[in-house]
């Protein structure tokens, strides 16, 4: 999906849902212009989310639910389409399960979530003179850093998986020797006993000999 130059989401109090959805769009298109409002302009040309009853708005019936019963919010709806292109299908699913679903659940049901609470604290207090949009984009900047690290970590696992798969294919006598210490043992799924060796473990063995 090509990200357009303009995005529109709801104004007023913001939540982790619309904040992380905005962060995702900024990661994919850093120059995107996000506008907040209470009504989507009739002539708006761009992506609309968390408002407007479109593809990326969960405030409509019938609601969309995951197979495990967790309802989608805007962030989850966007990630379902855009996430696999960033980290691949498997890692996109894992990020959804472990990171996004708790945020979506909070937005839809009020289920307690510390990260959602932290993002919510960026909203100006009742007697503040701060501009609400400015506060929103401060929260987006923080969410963007968190999401960027999620994506970076997921792609690091993808790279490690490739290394381990290659090492497994080159294994001899049940010994898998990886060129570096990496988080990839979970890809060794064949029912074959494996002895893992890395440069670090080999060096440790030499020192103890």
Residue locations for each model-derived region?
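Gly/His-enriched, cation/cofactor- and phosphate-binding structural elements
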Residues: 166-209
């Amino acid at each position: 999906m090509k990200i357009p130059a303009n995005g529109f989401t709801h104004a007023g109090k913001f939540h982790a849902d619309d904040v992380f959805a905005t962060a995702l769009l900024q990661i994919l298109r850093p120059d995107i212009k996000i506008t907040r409002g209470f009504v989507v302009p009739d002539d708006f040309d761009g992506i609309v989310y968390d408002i407007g009853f479109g593809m990326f708005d969960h405030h409509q019936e019938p609601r969309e639910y995951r197979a495990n019963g967790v309802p989608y919010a805007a962030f989850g709806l966007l990630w379902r389409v855009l996430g696999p292109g960033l980290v691949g299908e498997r890692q996109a699913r894992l990020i959804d399960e472990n990171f996004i679903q708790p945020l979506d659940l909070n937005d839809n049901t009020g289920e307690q979530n510390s990260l959602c609470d932290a993002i919510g604290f960026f909203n100006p207090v009742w007697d503040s003179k701060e501009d609400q949009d400015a506060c929103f984009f401060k929260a987006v900047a923080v969410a963007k850093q968190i999401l960027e690290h999620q994506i970076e970590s997921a792609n690091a696992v993808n790279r490690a998986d490739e290394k381990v798969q290659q090492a497994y294919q080159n294994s001899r006598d049940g010994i898998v020797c990886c060129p570096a210490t990496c988080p990839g043992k979970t890809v060794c799924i064949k029912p074959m006993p494996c002895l893992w060796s890395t440069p670090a473990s080999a060096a440790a063995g030499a020192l103890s000999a």
